[in-house]
Amino acid sequence: MQDAIQAGLGVLSSVQYVELGAIKIFSDGALGGWTAWLTNVYSDDKGNCGFNIHSTAELERIVQDARKYRLPVAVHAIGDQAILEVASTLKKYPLPNKWRERI
């Protein structure tokens, strides 16, 4: 994100072959690899509920950094716990313009 900002890119600005639409964040993994972050354990992998890639504090910092530049975020969140965490963070730090977030 910092490189894009330093290059003067903002929402829908572009350079050759690249257009910035949102800051992409990965919050968890995938269901097939048992890494999507769930509120309950996987039925076929007891003791495993997946994991979050960023702590709550790290996720909030990334979103706050995007907000400094009025950038929306697009978040990969597959598991229900990941979706809850991301939705809570986005509600806490709303986007101050017309652009839309994506989960």
Task: State what each model feature region is.
Residues 12-13, 92-99:
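Short helix-capping segments at alpha-helix termini
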Residues 18, 98-102:
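Residue-level recognition of the N-termini of beta-strands and the immediately preceding loop/turn
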Residues 1-80, 84, 88:
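Metal-coordinating catalytic core of metallo-dependent amide/deamination hydrolases
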Residues 23, 102-103:
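Extended hydrophobic secondary-structure segments that form protein cores and membrane-embedded regions
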